[in-house]
Amino acid sequence: VPRARLLRPAPPGEADHAVTVRRAGPADHAAAVALAVATFDYTGLVAAPRRANTADLLGPGLRAALDEAEPAVWLAEEDGEIRALAHCAWVDSAPGSEAGELLPAGRWGYVNNVVTAPGERGGGFGRALMAHVHRELHRGGATRTYLYYNPTNPLSSVFWHRQGYRPLWTSWEVRPAGALR
């Protein structure tokens, strides 16, 4: 279910324990891929099964994102250990453009993948990370943000609602397609 969020300047929040958030770089590729794969390990339990080559599929896109001058990838750390990742992008929507078919005109922040390391979920890392990421997307010119999430994931539906996201549009699918018969 795609969700959208109107981006407003965030009030300064209290830091969750000693969480620090930083922009990721090329040296973080292996850790970023490992965290991104952890998303699919979890959603594979509640949605479509995870593919054995998930890391191979995600690696090149993360490499390209991390090689950008200012990657839209952030990491939350505690005591120097990476606990969470947010892989995002900026999307410019204009009438007649591909993005314009789905989004109102303007500069959008796209939240592609957010994951907290297994065993760390519920510890405030995702909340601290996204507070920082929303501010950074706003500074980068985004006036709104959007994301897609899997409604069968019981963690994401609660998390994103608490982050202020509301439905922009809804799409449904059935797997396998033969189940429609």
How does the language model describe each region?
Residues 1, 137-149:
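Conserved GNAT acetyl-CoA-binding A-motif
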Residues 1, 127, 151-169:
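Conserved active-site alpha-helix within GNAT-family acetyltransferase domains
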Residues 1-16, 169-177:
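Acyl-donor-binding surface of acyltransferase catalytic domains
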Residues 20-34:
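A short beta-loop-alpha structural element at the N-terminal edge
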Residues 43-61:
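Conserved GNAT-fold acetyl-CoA-binding loop/helix
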Residues 113-116, 122-135, 162:
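Conserved acetyl-CoA-binding loop-helix of GNAT-fold acetyltransferases
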Residues 117-128, 140, 152-157:
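Conserved glycine-rich acetyl-CoA-binding loop
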Residues 146-156, 173-178:
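Conserved beta-strand-loop-alpha-helix junction that forms the acyl-donor binding cleft
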